[in-house]
């Protein structure tokens, strides 16, 4: 379900000393859907923290785009900002594009960003099939194992369960 073409833009600014945000997300695209996720987090005060984990899967001819930017302004010393985007391409015609950025104007910070795009591990698929798990079920299980990290970071138990059910229904 969902729109064929969608853009989701998140903008967060840390205006208070010691502000913290966890801005995670996941996407699961199929058909010819195109999703553009844009995230901009600005640290303007000191001792702020950002933790962002985005994971996604593109199947069929779907296209996913992630543009993430963390900006640490002058005077925002003590900032700890982490951004990760990891995606799976689940068909030959699917596409994932990613552009993670860190822009740092302060000196005393701990910041990191990372991006990976790949496919399911063929040896893991083979291993599961050799133990009697059908290929489609093995793909679904490995995809769920890849994405579940984002869901496990949801603090509210009820919301976490709803997200797990949502994911299971779509795999």
PLM regions: where:
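Conserved beta-strand/loop scaffold segments within soluble protein domains that form the structured core
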Residues: 1-126, 130-133, 147, 154-171
């Amino acid at each position: 379900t969902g729109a064929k073409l969608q853009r989701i833009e998140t903008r967060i600014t840390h205006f208070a000393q010691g502000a913290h945000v966890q801005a995670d997300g996941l996407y699961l695209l199929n058909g010819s859907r195109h999703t553009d996720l844009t995230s901009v987090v600005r640290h303007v005060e000191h001792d702020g923290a950002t933790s962002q984990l985005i994971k996604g899967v593109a199947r069929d001819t779907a296209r996913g785009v992630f543009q993430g930017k963390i900006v640490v302004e002058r005077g925002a010393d003590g900032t700890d900002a982490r951004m990760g985007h990891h995606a799976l391409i689940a068909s030959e015609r699917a596409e994932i594009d990613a552009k993670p950025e860190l822009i740092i104007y302060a000196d005393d910070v701990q910041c990191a960003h990372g991006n990976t795009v790949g496919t399911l591990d063929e040896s893991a698929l083979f291993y599961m099939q050799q133990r009697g798990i059908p290929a489609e079920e093995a793909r679904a299980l490995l995809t769920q194992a890849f994405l579940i990290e984002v869901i496990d970071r949801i603090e509210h138990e009820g919301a976490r369960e709803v997200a797990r059910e949502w994911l299971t229904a779509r795999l």
